From Swiss-Prot:
The lineage of its organism: Eukaryota, Metazoa, Ecdysozoa, Nematoda, Chromadorea. Disruption phenotype: Beginning in the L3 stage, animals display striking and progressive defects in morphology of the epidermis and cuticle in several body regions, particularly in the nose, tail, vulva, and the dorsal midline in the region of the posterior pharyngeal bulb. The cuticle in these regions becomes up to 5-10 times thicker than the wild-type, at the expense of underlying epidermis. Up-regulates innate immune responses to damage. Decreases starvation-induced autophagy. Disorganization and hyper-stabilization of epidermal microtubules and reduced microtubule growth rates. ANK repeats lie at residues 392-421, 425-454, 458-487, 491-520, 524-553, 557-586, 590-619, 623-652, 810-841, 934-963. Its main location: cytoplasm. Expressed in epidermis, muscles and neurons. Keywords: ANK repeat, ATP-binding, Cytoplasm, Cytoskeleton, Developmental protein, GTP-binding, Immunity, Innate immunity, Kinase, Magnesium, Metal-binding, Nucleotide-binding, Repeat, Serine/threonine-protein kinase, Transferase. This is Death-associated protein kinase dapk-1. It holds the Pfam family Ank. It catalyses: L-seryl-[protein] + ATP = O-phospho-L-seryl-[protein] + ADP + H(+); L-threonyl-[protein] + ATP = O-phospho-L-threonyl-[protein] + ADP + H(+). The active site is at 155 (proton acceptor). Interacts with ptrn-1. ATP binds at residues 34-42, 57. Residues 28-289 form the Protein kinase domain.
Length: 1425
């Protein structure tokens, strides 16, 4: 039991024991090992001064509270205190001294060298009871000494009764490791001792007492007299049963000659009741111990103990140990013998089993083996018989180190294992542990203060091995020991070379911190920078450069780090080297420069960077070839363009006499040859080059975008701004634009399109008529017949302001669904118009709508400015139209209309949106019919100022831009019927027809500038890689979108929104390929193909209302009872109401696409109606619909598939949120979960669980959440459909890291906490709460440019990542008294983050039939539910 039962940590005193920290080996010389235990080894030592010999017990300390290795300091101190207290008795081992090292406590005791008492008895020919009683009396005297001091030994057994010297009869009690100090009345319970010798109270876990030792004395006496163990059974359970029942007997075979006094002595000790058991004093007075009184005959002399019985006992013990040893060996080697891997050696079973246990980490077997045989931790295998075996010479410690078995390694070390042993490769265990990234073992060895710079046969130190393992923990550990960093291995590589070539880029910065030599070279003459440049880790290269590594050092072939980086395709590293000032014109031994290498390998970015840094472009190599020759030979046309722009000489010839053009011909590089041929002339080449340089002037125009509801005066304002000549000029320009670009076909006036048959009247003219009376009952009725259709685009030169591309966005609401493709850029001016004749409430709602519309469609930019201001605010001017003197009788000194009500309203709007928009503080009220009104002049002044400010921030136009603009007019005529081309076609158009040297970057800049001046529209295609360029924005906005989304078309459209491609020919007969137009409409996400019908579905056209029966209880009560419900409403953040209405058709498009993308969708059906969709997937169904301002999702399915229902719902939520984010990236969404209980009851108005309630529940660590109707439900039911498996994989919102906060959350906090607070509850006090006072000066130094709150949160996430969670931040905000900031955080953080369940769990589930483009998992696979 002493080996298998852990001792308790009962302290004997509250005082701390102090040990001598003098180096032990300075005082004593360590000699042979005398014995060992689990965590201790006893060795004979000799005092260096006196020569006196002692027994030193080396006890391994437990280093960590959670570790299982070693003995706790509390237990060691307890043993020392016991030994100190019991000094001075001749029958107890004497304490001499106690020392302490980093890993051990060494207890120095008197040397007891006489051996065990029983061995002494076995050596005698005979032994009578008098001698036996004398031995027992000495044990009793020792026990009396202990008990008088309230010490209980608890492990009295034959092995702990020793003779002081060989041949001497004086005994000593040893081993006080389990001893306790038990004061009278104290209750101490513990399972300690050796099974055969423990008392019943130990087995029954009852209070220990001095009587516990007396039971053990009885067992020792029984064995001494008979040679048999009184309670020993076939197994431990039987032994314990015998003890608790006090089941023993005096066999005639062994006790035939034993005196009755001896039997009575034993009988008095084997008493279950501790109060009735004989005490030590009673035992000393017992006749068998005391002997006869006076001259009485001593009957003990007549009783002679049969020595053979004791010898048999010892023999049985030895045989038992041998059998147990064989069993342990066979069991430990079972796996090796079964697979026959050659590790088990029958000729050396103990050594081979030791090695096997070391490899397998079988500490339990080692404990058993150690108890039966001396361990051989330094043994090695004789030969290699399999690939599994370790190298020759590998000891058990090498094996344990390789496989990371730290406890086994520690055990071997305590058993005398050589921690510095070397195998045949010269590796020590530290080398092996580091090579295999076993940081725990490496840490153990490192703490033993061994030579960390020891090298093996290949010159490697342990640090070499650690770096090769790429394990940062091991490297950090070794660096704490300050190893040498300049030692090379057999290849000449220092640890820095190896780190530069490691797969782990974090090692080089660690080494660089210790200032290693950076100039050392390996046998290839490479510095670490060369190696890092070849490997490709940017962080490594940067760290070496920051440490002043020689940047232009050359290796054996004359190559610098720059050339090596380019040879390996590491362009990012090449850019860093160039930025740090390396020699870009250096040539290697072959004459190749970095430009030659980059041109040869097609590294366009590198060539561009080198040319930008004025590299010598015509440098020749050993073959007289320039970079242009190499680019021509390998056909890198884009690089040829860059070299020509850098004015490379096209006439230079190589050693073969060929120019670059001829080289391209010889290599059959036709495109390269064509390009070089076109620029052969110096004059033409210079002209092309000059076109691709920016001009000194600004762009000719910018966009002016007008937004407002119908009848807000947009068209009339544009008319007035267009020309001082008034409406006749405007009508003339409209007529000209229509006649130039397209003409309405006659069929469009007579024949419309329908899913079956039908017609409608439609005209492309913006001012076409519409029968309002006929459409009075239609949901698509416009407010007036002359409403703007789509987006009217025209160029206007405003007198005194300059030229603008004016984009008038129609106010007709169905058109809003596609406006996100045309708004969102900050490099333009937005005019929001409202009618001053409308009631103030109407004005306010309309302005809020368009401000929110713009805010939602403008992507917020980093960094966050002071008070949450966006770094790039769009310019917005709010203009009141229809202003007359009758409405505004008061004017200011400049003659402008004045209105305190409107001024107050606009101030409210400015305060609400100033973080996102740059808004003018002047009140602009005008009459659009009067070009000379003061308000018009004010507007023009503001437009001129804004235009100047925006143009000043934009890049200067390329000289080629005007040429492209002029050429586009010709291209538009060529593509008049369908002015749309792909992006690759546009690039080829520019190169083939304008300038062949135009690169991709030039084309991107040209298109960007053409968009800024309103010449075309660039459509990004998420369906495939081919983006599109619309050459005529007016055609696109008015003729296509204005017609398809007009009231005329919508009122006659197919009720189910389904159209075949051929149907488009009836609307747009002039377009030759209707499939091209359908593709463009798909790119705009106005439609999606329906795989079942082969037609395209246009959700915006759908007029059919959803039936009332789409969400009713199941007719079968059993099915309804076994159904789980769930739901959520996705709302825009507070203050952005009605932001999702225009996005719902796009959500329906995304739903249809998801069904198409999911191939095995035969069991999945999607039905769509106006503002409602229903998805049925096998036995699950969901309804997605607009409810007020929210998109509501309700789902239900079988209760046994609750986990799959969560997946189903989660995918739908992600799909809706992703679709909404594509339309409005600035719309922050909230999830309001619906009561599953109320859904199951089919209540008309179910309770909701808003984000604040969900987050508050998490903060309280509650399991239930309270809804809006004050009813509580379990969080798992509300979110997880009752699935606890799902709940276990959720990361709650309070546990989300601050570093992962979305920008909306950060902006809200900045807006609330950046401004100074009257009570000081702002960012400065927050810094104190976050323990970031040291960072305050740096944060405060940024002034008004950056948000101090946002910077603080970033610092918190960096310096305290474990504490920087949303939950902790919310708690701190409450302590700060800023519940408003907490509530804002509650509304904007994710309520949970979901990690998908294990694959084996998912295999048991079915598929949902929904593909979410924002799925929680790392891969965009179909959802497995």
């Amino acid at each position: 039991m002493s080996d298998d039962v852990n001792s308790s940590a009962t302290s004997t005193s509250s005082s701390t024991v102090h040990f001598d920290d003098t180096p032990f080996e300075d005082v004593y010389e360590i000699e042979t090992e005398l014995g060992s235990g689990q965590f201790a080894v006893v060795r004979r030592v000799r005092d260096r001064k006196t020569g006196e010999k002692y027994a030193a017990k080396f006890i391994k300390k437990r280093r960590y509270a959670t570790s299982r290795r070693g003995v706790t300091r509390q237990n060691i101190e307890r043993e020392v205190r016991v030994l100190q207290k019991i000094r001075g008795n001749s029958n107890v081992v004497e304490l001499h001294a106690v020392y302490e090292t980093a890993s051990d406590v060494i207890i120095v005791l008197e040397l007891v060298s006489g051996g065990e008492l029983f061995d002494h008895v076995c050596a005698k020919e005979c032994l009578d009871e008098v001698e036996a009683a004398a031995f027992i009396k000495q044990i009793l005297l020792a026990v009396r000494h202990l008990h008088s001091l309230h010490i209980v030994h608890l492990d009295i057994k034959p092995e702990n009764v020793m003779l002081k010297q060989r041949g001497d009869s004086q005994i000593k009690i040893i081993d006080f490791g389990l001893s306790r100090e038990i004061e009278p009345g104290a209750v101490v319970k513990d399972m300690v001792g050796t099974p055969e010798f423990v008392a019943p109270e130990v087995v029954n876990y009852e209070a220990l007492s001095p009587a516990t030792d007396m039971w053990a004395v009885g067992v020792v006496t029984y064995i001494l007299l008979s040679g048999g163990s009184p309670f020993l059974g076939d197994n431990r359970d039987e032994t314990f049963s015998n003890i608790t029942r006090v089941r023993y007997h005096f066999s005639d075979r062994y006790f035939k000659n034993t005196s009755k006094h001896a039997k009575d002595f034993i009988y008095r000790l084997f008493v279950r009741d501790v109060d009735q058991r004989a005490t030590v004093e009673e035992c000393l007075q017992h006749p068998w111990i005391r002997g006869p009184e006076g001259n009485a005959i001593d009957i003990r002399k007549a009783s002679c103990i049969t020595i053979s019985h004791i010898q048999s006992f010892k023999t049985r013990q030895r045989w038992k140990r041998c059998v147990e040893l064989v069993m342990v060996l066979l069991k430990a080697s079972k796996s090796s013998r079964r697979i026959g891997d050659g590790r088990f050696d029958e000729e050396d079973m103990v050594a081979s089993c030791t090695l096997i246990c070391a490899e397998e980490g079988n500490l339990r077997a080692l404990h058993k083996l150690s108890a039966l045989h001396k361990l051989l931790p330094n043994a090695t295998r004789k030969s290699l018989k399999s690939s599994f075996s370790e190298p020759n010479g590998a000891t058990a410690m090498h094996c344990a180190a390789k496989y990371g078995h730290a406890e086994v390694f520690n055990y071997f070390h305590m058993k005398g294992g050589n921690i510095c042993a070397r195998d045949d490769n010269g590796d020590t265990p530290l080398h092996v542990a580091c090579r295999f990234a076993q940081h725990t073992v490496a840490g153990y060895v490192a703490n033993e203060k061994i030579d960390v710079d020891s090298i093996n046969k290949t010159g490697e130190t342990a640090l070499h091995c650690a770096v090769e393992s790429a394990d940062t923990r091991v490297v950090r550990l070794l660096l704490q020991l300050r190893p040498r960093l300049d030692l090379p291995n057999a290849s000449g590589d220092t640890v820095l070379h190896l780190a530069a070539d490691s797969i782990n880029p974090r090692i080089v910065p660690l080494l660089v911190c210790l200032a290693p030599p950076l100039h050392l070279r390996n046998i290839r003459e490479e510095t670490p920078l060369h190696v890092a440049a070849a490997r490709g880790h940017v962080d490594c290269v940067q760290a070496l450069l920051d440490a002043n590594s020689p940047i232009d050092a050359v290796e054996q072939d004359g190559k610098t780090a720059l050339i090596i980086a380019l040879e390996n395709g590491n362009v990012d590293i090449a850019s860093i080297l160039i930025t740090n000032g390396c020699d870009i014109n250096h040539a290697d031994h072959h004459g190749d420069t970095a430009l030659h290498i980059a041109s040869k390998h097609g590294l366009l970015q590198a060539v561009q960077t080198l040319c930008h840094c004025a590299v010598t472009v015509d440098s020749v190599n050993a073959n007289k070839k320039t970079a242009l020759h190499l680019a021509a030979h390998y056909g890198h046309v884009d690089i040829i363009r860059v070299l020509l722009l850098a004015r490379a000489d096209v006439t230079l010839r190589g050693d073969d006499g060929l120019t670059a053009e001829l080289v391209a011909v010889a290599a059959e590089r036709l495109e390269a040859h064509s390009l070089l041929k076109m620029v052969k002339s110096q004059e033409i080449r210079e002209e092309y080059i000059s076109q691709l340089y920016p001009l000194d002037t600004s762009l000719r125009r910018i966009k002016l975008k007008l937004l407002g509801h119908s009848q807000s005066g947009k068209t009339r304002l544009v008319q007035t701004l267009h020309s001082s000549r008034g409406i006749s000029s405007f009508l003339e320009s409209v007529t000209r634009r229509i006649s130039d670009h397209y003409s309405p076909s006659s069929s469009m006036k007579d024949d419309g399109i329908h899913s079956t048959n039908g017609s409608f009247v439609s005209e492309s003219n913006n001012n076409s008529s519409f029968d309002l009376a006929a459409a009075a009952g239609s949901k698509y009725a416009p407010p007036h017949s002359q409403y703007t259709r789509g987006i009217d685009v025209q160029t206007v030169n405003i007198n005194g302001c300059g030229e603008f591309s004016v984009w008038e966005f129609g106010g007709y609401e169905p058109m809003h669904t596609c406006y996100d493709h045309f708004v969102g850029n900050a490099d333009c001016i937005h005019l929001i118009l409202y009618r001053t004749s409308d009631p103030t409430e109407v004005q306010y709602k309309q302005i809020l709508y368009w401000m929110n519309f713009l805010k939602g469609r403008v992507t917020p930019f980093e960094p966050i400015g002071h008070c949450g201001f966006s770094s790039r605010r769009s310019k917005v001017i709010i203009v009141g139209t229809h202003a007359t003197s009758s409405l505004f009788p008061q004017m200011n000194q400049e003659g402008e209309y004045v209105s305190s009500d409107i001024e107050a309203m606009l101030n409210t709007v400015r305060l609400r949106f100033e973080t996102h928009f740059d808004m003018d503080h002047r009140l602009i009220l005008l009459d659009a019919t009067n070009p000379s009104c003061i308000g018009m002049k004010t507007l023009k002044m503001e437009l001129a100022k804004c235009r100047t400010n925006i143009l000043a921030k934009l890049l200067k136009p390329l000289a080629i831009l005007d040429t492209v603009v002029n050429h586009l007019n010709l291209v538009r005529k060529k593509h008049a019927n369908f002015p749309v081309i792909t992006w690759p076609d546009f690039i080829q158009l520019v190169r083939n027809e304008i300038n062949p040297l135009t690169g991709d970057a030039h084309c991107r800049q040209i298109v960007q500038q053409l968009q800024l001046i309103g010449e075309l529209v660039y459509l990004r295609n998420d369906l495939c890689d081919a983006d599109y360029v619309v050459l005529n924005a007016e055609w696109f906005g008015t003729h296509i979108l204005g017609q398809l989304l007009s009231a005329e078309f919508l009122s006659k459209a197919s009720p189910n929104g389904s159209y075949h491609t051929s149907s488009l020919a009836k609307i747009f007969p002039e377009i030759p390929e209707q499939s091209d137009l359908m593709t463009i409409l798909e790119v705009l996400q106005l439609c999606a193909p329906d795989a079942r019908t082969g037609a395209h579905e246009f959700p915006v056209f759908i007029q059919t209302e959803a039936p009332d029966s789409i969400w009713r209880p199941y007719s079968l009560k059993e099915k309804e009872r076994d159904t789980v419900y769930g739901g959520v409403r996705i709302l825009p953040m507070r203050g952005m109401e009605r932001s999702l209405h225009s996005t719902f058709p796009r959500i329906q498009v995304a739903l249809r696409r998801s069904i198409n993308d999911y191939q095995p969708a035969k069991d999945t059906q999607l039905h769509q109606w106006s503002e409602c969709s229903k998805l049925v997937s096998q036995d699950r169904e969901a309804v997605i619909r607009m409810v007020g301002d929210a998109v509501e999702i309700r789902a239900r399915g079988p209760s046994e598939s609750a986990t799959s229902m969560f997946y189903f719902m989660e995918d739908l939520i992600n799909l809706v949120e992703h679709a909404a984010a594509e339309v409005g990236p600035g719309i922050s969404l909230e999830r309001h979960f619906i009561s599953p209980k109320h859904l199951k009851e089919h209540r008309e108005h179910p309770a909701l669980f808003p984000p604040e309630s969900m987050m508050e529940m998490q903060q309280r660590e509650s399991l239930s959440v309270k809804g809006t109707q004050d009813e509580e439900e379990l969080f798992t039911d509300v979110v997880c459909f009752g699935s606890r498996d799902v709940a276990r994989h959720l990361t709650l919102g309070i546990d989300v890291g601050v570093a992962d906060l979305q920008m909306a959350s950060r902006c809200e906090l900045a807006c609330l906490l950046d401004p100074p607070h009257a009570m000081g509850r702002d960012w400065s006090i927050l810094a104190v709460k976050l323990q970031l006072t040291d960072q305050v000066p740096d944060v405060d130094s940024t002034g008004q440019s950056l948000s101090r709150t946002d910077q603080l949160l970033n610092e918190w996430a960096i310096h305290h990542p474990e504490q920087a969670s949303v939950g902790n931040l919310c708690r701190i905000l409450v302590e700060l008294g800023r519940c408003d900031a907490r509530d804002a955080l509650y509304r904007t953080v994710p309520l949970y983050v979901f990690a998908p369940l294990e694959d084996q769990f998912l295999l048991e589930t079915n598929d949902s039939g929904v593909v979410s483009s924002c799925h929680s998992s790392s891969e965009h696979n179909p959802i497995n539910i």
